């Protein structure tokens, strides 16, 4: 997932070859870009760890606190476009004011119910939530536990014959969120999700593989690991992020990532797969599986020694990754299916795609 919107039954999240995200479309308001002179609210470059309210470390993992029938009412604080002009789509960082009343853990998701989701046979609106992975730690971007952030790609449908956008087929929830203004009320469900949680062992290496907004849960990870001072959680392992996007303008949270890489050179690694700017070893486009393959031997060794591997993003990323890993496993004399099952059994293998 991501912020992703998740499950396949969510119409505006379902990705087809003809569902594209336009960066500029005449007559439609876009996410407001932040002026060059104004600091972005979507990134933190100050790497001096900040103190956070430890009460959020207490108790059991929150799960399904709010439902479609009884959602939580939150308000949008800000919406910021975080992709550049040459990106193939528009992605927004959205900060939501929750007042700490819908707590979550890193790796979980919120449901968002957009207005006018579905009308039943009696003419009444039926609330249907779209799921988005949360892109902040449980303490929010401010570190006080009063907000949560989403990373949302605006989904629009472009007719393959005319090349024009069809407003009737645009993603309902993603456009509602990207068009929101400060103070906009949103109905939320959740939190949900157990698949992408951080391991209890703070020494375990983390290998995170993302495409697009699949980076959202991993942002919650790296902020907990490197930006926040949590007395009960001192991350000492390796954090390795592989990120696949089209080009440099499509990189998400790169300033924050570069600041972490500079502050923790021996503990944080970052590798991009830029399909429209880089070539793989065979001269073709550099996709996420190609970049991961460059370090396959090291990754297999890390997994043999207790590393956790996470995948989040478009479901189309997984076949190429699985084919590559199966080929490498065979070269190493391993049965791929048994190898993966062994990792799943030890809870080292985490996949959430949409």
Curated annotation (Swiss-Prot):
<feature type="binding site">
    <location>
        <position position="285"/>
    </location>
    <ligand>
        <name>NADP(+)</name>
    </ligand>
</feature>
<dbReference type="GO" id="GO:0004324">
    <property type="term" value="F:ferredoxin-NADP+ reductase activity"/>
</dbReference>
<dbReference type="InterPro" id="IPR001709">
    <property type="entry name" value="Flavoprot_Pyr_Nucl_cyt_Rdtase"/>
</dbReference>
<feature type="transit peptide" description="Chloroplast">
    <location>
        <begin position="1"/>
        <end position="35"/>
    </location>
</feature>
<keyword id="KW-0150">Chloroplast</keyword>
<feature type="binding site">
    <location>
        <begin position="275"/>
        <end position="276"/>
    </location>
    <ligand>
        <name>NADP(+)</name>
    </ligand>
</feature>
<comment type="pathway">
    <text>Energy metabolism; photosynthesis.</text>
</comment>
<feature type="binding site">
    <location>
        <position position="213"/>
    </location>
    <ligand>
        <name>NADP(+)</name>
    </ligand>
</feature>
<feature type="binding site">
    <location>
        <begin position="245"/>
        <end position="246"/>
    </location>
    <ligand>
        <name>NADP(+)</name>
    </ligand>
</feature>
<feature type="binding site">
    <location>
        <begin position="172"/>
        <end position="174"/>
    </location>
    <ligand>
        <name>FAD</name>
    </ligand>
</feature>
<feature type="binding site">
    <location>
        <begin position="130"/>
        <end position="133"/>
    </location>
    <ligand>
        <name>FAD</name>
    </ligand>
</feature>
<dbReference type="GO" id="GO:0015979">
    <property type="term" value="P:photosynthesis"/>
</dbReference>
<dbReference type="InterPro" id="IPR039261">
    <property type="entry name" value="FNR_nucleotide-bd"/>
</dbReference>
<keyword id="KW-0249">Electron transport</keyword>
<feature type="modified residue" description="N6,N6,N6-trimethyllysine">
    <location>
        <position position="118"/>
    </location>
</feature>
<feature type="domain" description="FAD-binding FR-type">
    <location>
        <begin position="69"/>
        <end position="198"/>
    </location>
</feature>
<keyword id="KW-0488">Methylation</keyword>
<keyword id="KW-0813">Transport</keyword>
<dbReference type="Pfam" id="PF00175">
    <property type="entry name" value="NAD_binding_1"/>
</dbReference>
<keyword id="KW-0934">Plastid</keyword>
<feature type="modified residue" description="N6,N6,N6-trimethyllysine">
    <location>
        <position position="124"/>
    </location>
</feature>
<feature type="binding site">
    <location>
        <position position="133"/>
    </location>
    <ligand>
        <name>NADP(+)</name>
    </ligand>
</feature>
<feature type="binding site">
    <location>
        <begin position="151"/>
        <end position="153"/>
    </location>
    <ligand>
        <name>FAD</name>
    </ligand>
</feature>
<comment type="similarity">
    <text>Belongs to the ferredoxin--NADP reductase type 1 family.</text>
</comment>
<feature type="binding site">
    <location>
        <position position="153"/>
    </location>
    <ligand>
        <name>NADP(+)</name>
    </ligand>
</feature>
<keyword id="KW-0521">NADP</keyword>
<protein>
    <recommendedName>
        <fullName>Ferredoxin--NADP reductase, chloroplastic</fullName>
        <ecNumber>1.18.1.2</ecNumber>
    </recommendedName>
</protein>
<feature type="binding site">
    <location>
        <position position="352"/>
    </location>
    <ligand>
        <name>NADP(+)</name>
    </ligand>
</feature>
<keyword id="KW-0809">Transit peptide</keyword>
<dbReference type="InterPro" id="IPR015701">
    <property type="entry name" value="FNR"/>
</dbReference>
<dbReference type="InterPro" id="IPR001433">
    <property type="entry name" value="OxRdtase_FAD/NAD-bd"/>
</dbReference>
<comment type="function">
    <text>May play a key role in regulating the relative amounts of cyclic and non-cyclic electron flow to meet the demands of the plant for ATP and reducing power.</text>
</comment>
<keyword id="KW-0285">Flavoprotein</keyword>
<dbReference type="InterPro" id="IPR017938">
    <property type="entry name" value="Riboflavin_synthase-like_b-brl"/>
</dbReference>
<keyword id="KW-0793">Thylakoid</keyword>
<feature type="modified residue" description="N6,N6-dimethyllysine">
    <location>
        <position position="170"/>
    </location>
</feature>
<keyword id="KW-0602">Photosynthesis</keyword>
<keyword id="KW-0274">FAD</keyword>
<dbReference type="GO" id="GO:0009570">
    <property type="term" value="C:chloroplast stroma"/>
</dbReference>
<dbReference type="GO" id="GO:0009535">
    <property type="term" value="C:chloroplast thylakoid membrane"/>
</dbReference>
<feature type="binding site">
    <location>
        <begin position="313"/>
        <end position="314"/>
    </location>
    <ligand>
        <name>NADP(+)</name>
    </ligand>
</feature>
<keyword id="KW-0560">Oxidoreductase</keyword>
